[in-house]
Structures are given as structure tokens and as C-alpha cells.
């Protein structure tokens, strides 16, 4: 039997998705499930091993999360991390204590080099701790394999049962040899095979769609973003013109976006219909300043437009969506519908007349979607397009929306994108855009006093958009942006740079 998959069980830890990503980076497929999921609901074919994540609770609490007890009877190695470490000890008869001194941040680790988990790891290294509880008495059959100044059992193992655990977090970059420790478990102890490759995934998913949906018609709402574009391209390669795509111009797109996106779609051979409903959307938004209300107006009318166009096409039994793995994970946590308000088609209602959803990207993270896009021939510029919110520029204009405010955002955003690309930073910054603010400041243009609006520049770095830092833009670039935006865009009097991280802020201003 092939050993191709690592099962990650989430106990509520903040690094759950990161663990999955770290395993996939090795070329091994990993998937995430809630810890209390019944094993009968999970496909265990080709299972190589199991990882138990961290979590915020104490195993001593009667309400703390618990896993299906059968995970220890599957005959595959298990690795516990943080809470998972304590959980393995607790359920096997050991004890857990809450000392006066918790352990947070970087810590010196000393390991027993006889342990397979620490093969080729120095005896001493830096790791990342984030815990209050710790193992007190080891469960029978276990031995300690690592320690820190404050934690005697920073790692343990029972090799007879292939059970391993660590109190620290090897998945975070702060743990000096964390990735190597994970590799020792996944590739060494579990002997998982490196079969997770985008080239193979592309062939398999296209063949699967072709076989399963032969002769069926499908419809896909395109946003111009990478997820929906890659999803549509995959499905189109499987069923050709039986896929009808709809691209709605709601009047809130970036400069020349509708034209460039449509040219790209045509170049990909997609069967696309563009619907210009910009006047309808802007009329509905007139005078509205509340950000949540603006979102709802746009989302609701998008649904109405999409339903109207879908009825015109007729005969489409399936809806294609660019749902990606973080969406699936979040849906599972919330016990929510697969169709969610943040999806790129605007949150389509469940009562639309379709047999079902087709979600070819539902197993992939954003970076994997980009890799897949490159693999199947989606143009590089499309694959690396900036993430763009469904409500578009409506949430980059603070307050009510007018054509003139949209003009200012479009023009300044175009300058920002052009200069970031000129400086070679367009693929190094996660997201960058401009925001129109209602603040006016005094200035001097020529020999006259000016009184124009402040435009904010936002640029952030991230890997998953869950946490972000303000990008450290070169001062020369910021000077150029300020000069060009103020001189070239009428109505702009001052440029400010937003250095807020997430948390506490969010990426968008509204």
C-alpha cells in the first residue's frame, strides 16, 4: 500500500493550516480535520501518519477537545504538537500540570540525539514555545527525548507504538530546525512518499471532471482573480464550451481591469460573457456610506444579476466555484454551508437551481493555486494578480461613492501598481492598493493655495492573509509615488502610508 497522506487533526491551534502547508512543502499530501471528527467520515486510504495540533485549552479540563480514540489503533505513527503532546501523554495514563511559570517565545532546546525524531539535529538549538501546561509524569512506555530550562519533557516517544510528541512548535519559522524535525517524522518515521505535485494534480483533476461530468453544462462566475480564473481554466480543459463563464462589471473595478481581464480570458479559450451592470450598482450605492451596507448592496445585487444571466443560458446543472482549502477548513469549523459570502461569486444562494457545486481547487492553498495556474498555462500576470475584494473599490472609498472618488482611486492605484512593478516588488508584496479618504489638507500647487484630499497607500506582506505586516517600501519608491500621484491625479493633495499590521488592523480599510 502506498503511504501518501498525512492526517492533521486540529485541536484549536492557531498554526493548524501552517502544519498542513509544511507537510505539503515536502511533496507529501496533508489534509486537516477537526479533532473530534469520526474516523469513519475520513478517507484513510494510503494514510502514512497523523499529526495532532496545538490548542488553547488544558487537557485536564473536562470540556477540552478530544479525538476519536481509534487514531492510536490505525497502525500509523502519530506526532503530537503542544496540546497534542500533552494529549498523547494524558490519554495514555500520564499526568499534566500547570506550573507557575508559563513558557512563551524562543527557548533553548536540548535533545536526545538517539531519537529518530531528532536525527541530524544539533544537540542544542532554538525552538518556539507557547504553553502554560506541561507533562509532569510520563505515561507508561514513554521516555523523554528533549528538555528546556523550564520543561523537563519538551519531547517524548514510545517507539514500540510509534507515538512521538513535542511541547514546542516545529512548524513555525522561529524553531531553528523545526522543518527538519517534521521531515524526520513525515519522511523518516512515517516513510511517506513524495507524490504531491501540481503537474500530476492537474492531470488527475481534469481527468476526474471529464469522466464524472461528461456532457454536463456548467456555469462559473468570474471575478478576475486568480482562484476563479484557475478553476474555470481547469474545468474548461475538461469539458470545453460546456462551461459558460460570466464576468460582471459592477463599475467598481480597477483602471482598465474589465478590458485586460476579458482579453486574458479569451486568450485562455474560455467561453466568457461580460455583463456591464456598472450603472445599476452605482445607482444602488448612491449616498450610502456604511461599509457593511455597501457590501450587502453589492453582494445582493450581484446575486440578482448572476441569477438573471444564468437563466438566460439555461441547461447548466452545475456551478463552478474557486473555493480554496482555507475556505473549506473555515466552513468545517463553523459548520457553515460550502457557499460563503466571501467567495468570489459574491455568495450565491443555496436555492439556486443546480444539481451541485464543482470546486476543483478545494484541496489547494493560495500558493498551490498559483503553481497550478502556471502549470496549466494561465498567464503569469493573471496568476500573480493582486487579491481584490468582491466589493471592489467600494471599500477603498471611505464613505459614500461618487464617480470622482472612484476616478481618484483608479488613477492612484494604477500609478502604485506601475511603480511597484518598476521596482521589481510586484511578486514580493502580498497586496498593495490606495484608499480615498474624506480628509482634506492645505497645500501649495504652483503659486496658489490648494485644499485637496488625502490618499492612503497600503502595502502588506503575508503568506496567507491571516496575519500581515506593512511592507518596508524603499524610500525612493514612496517619494516617487507621492510626486506622481499629487502631480498627475487631480484632487489629490497629500499621500500617507499605512503601517498598521494585522492584527490589530485588517488589510482593507472597510
Pin down the residues of each PLM region.
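RNA-binding accessory domains that recognize and position tRNA/RNA substrates
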Residues: 1-52, 56-62, 66-74, 86, ...
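Conserved helicase ATPase motor motifs in RecA-like P-loop NTPase domains
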Residues: 78-84
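Extended catalytic-interface subdomain
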Residues: 321-323
Amino acid at each position: 500500500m502506498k503511504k501518501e497522506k498525512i492526517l492533521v487533526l486540529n485541536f484549536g491551534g492557531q498554526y493548524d493550516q501552517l502544519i498542513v502547508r509544511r507537510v505539503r512543502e515536502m511533496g507529501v499530501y496533508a489534509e486537516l480535520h477537526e479533532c473530534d471528527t469520526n474516523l469513519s467520515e475520513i478517507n484513510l486510504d494510503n494514510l502514512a501518519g497523523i499529526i495532532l495540533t496545538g490548542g488553547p485549552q488544558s487537557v485536564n479540563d473536562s470540556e477540552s477537545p478530544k479525538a476519536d480514540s481509534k487514531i492510536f489503533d490505525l497502525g500509523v505513527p502519530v506526532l503530537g504538537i503542544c496540546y497534542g503532546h500533552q494529549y498523547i501523554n494524558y490519554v495514555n495514563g500520564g499526568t499534566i500540570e500547570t506550573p507557575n511559570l508559563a513558557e512563551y517565545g524562543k527557548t533553548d532546546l536540548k535533545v536526545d540525539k538517539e531519537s529518530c525524531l531528532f536525527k541530524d539535529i544539533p544537540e542544542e538549538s532554538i525552538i518556539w514555545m507557547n504553553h502554560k501546561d506541561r507533562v509532569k509524569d510520563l505515561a507508561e512506555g514513554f521516555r523523554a527525548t528533549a528538555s528546556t530550562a523550564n520543561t523537563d519533557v519538551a519531547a517524548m516517544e514510545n517507539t514500540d507504538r510509534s507515538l512521538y510528541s513535542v511541547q514546542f512548535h516545529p512548524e513555525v519559522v522561529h524553531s531553528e530546525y523545526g522543518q527538519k524535525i517534521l521531515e524526520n517524522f513525515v519522511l523518516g518515521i512515517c516513510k511517506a512518499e513524495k507524490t504531491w505535485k501540481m503537474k500530476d494534480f492537474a492531470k488527475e483533476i481534469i481527468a476526474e471532471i471529464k469522466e464524472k461530468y461528461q456532457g454536463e453544462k456548467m456555469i462559473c462566475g468570474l471575478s478576475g482573480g486568480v482562484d476563479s480564473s484557475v478553476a474555470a481554466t481547469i474545468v474548461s480543459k475538461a469539458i470545453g464550451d460546456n462551461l459558460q463563464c460570466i464576468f460582471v462589471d459592477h463599475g467598481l473595478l480597477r483602471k482598465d481591469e474589465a478590458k485586460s481581464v476579458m482579453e486574458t480570458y479569451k486568450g485562455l479559450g474560455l467561453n466568457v460573457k461580460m455583463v456591464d451592470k456598472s450603472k445599476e450598482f452605482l445607482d444602488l450605492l448612491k449616498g450610502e456610506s456604511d461599509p457593511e451596507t455597501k457590501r450587502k448592496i453589492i453582494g445582493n445585487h450581484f446575486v440578482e444579476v448572476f441569477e438573471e444571466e444564468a437563466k438566460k443560458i439555461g441547461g447548466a446543472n452545475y456551478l463552478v466555484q474557486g473555493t480554496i482549502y482555507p475556505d473549506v477548513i473555515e466552513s468545517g469549523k463553523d459548520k457553515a454551508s460550502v457557499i460563503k459570502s466571501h467567495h468570489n461569486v459574491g455568495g450565491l444562494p443555496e436555492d439556486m437551481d443546480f444539481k451541485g457545486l464543482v470546486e476543483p481547487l478545494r484541496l489547494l492553498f493560495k500558493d498551490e493555486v498559483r503553481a497550478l495556474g502556471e502549470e496549466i498555462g494561465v498567464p503569469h500576470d493573471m496568476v500573480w494578480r493582486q487579491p481584490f475584494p468582491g466589493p471592489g473599490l467600494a471599500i477603498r472609498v471611505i464613505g459614500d461613492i461618487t464617480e470622482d472618488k472612484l476616478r481618484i482611486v483608479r488613477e492612484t492605484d494604477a500609478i502604485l501598481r506601475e511603480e511597484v512593478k518598476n521596482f521589481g516588488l510586484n511578486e514580493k508584496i502580498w497586496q498593495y492598493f490606495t484608499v480615498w479618504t474624506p480628509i482634506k489638507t492645505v497645500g501649495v500647487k504652483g503659486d496658489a493655495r490648494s485644499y485637496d484630499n488625502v490618499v492612503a497607500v497600503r502595502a502588506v506582506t503575508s503568506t496567507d492573509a491571516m496575519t500581515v505586516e506593512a511592507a518596508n517600501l524603499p524610500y525612493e519608491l514612496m517619494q516617487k509615488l507621492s510626486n506622481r500621484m499629487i502631480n498627475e491625479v487631480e484632487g489629490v493633495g497629500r499621500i500617507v502610508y499605512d503601517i498598521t499590521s494585522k492584527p490589530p488592523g485588517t488589510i482593507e480599510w472597510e
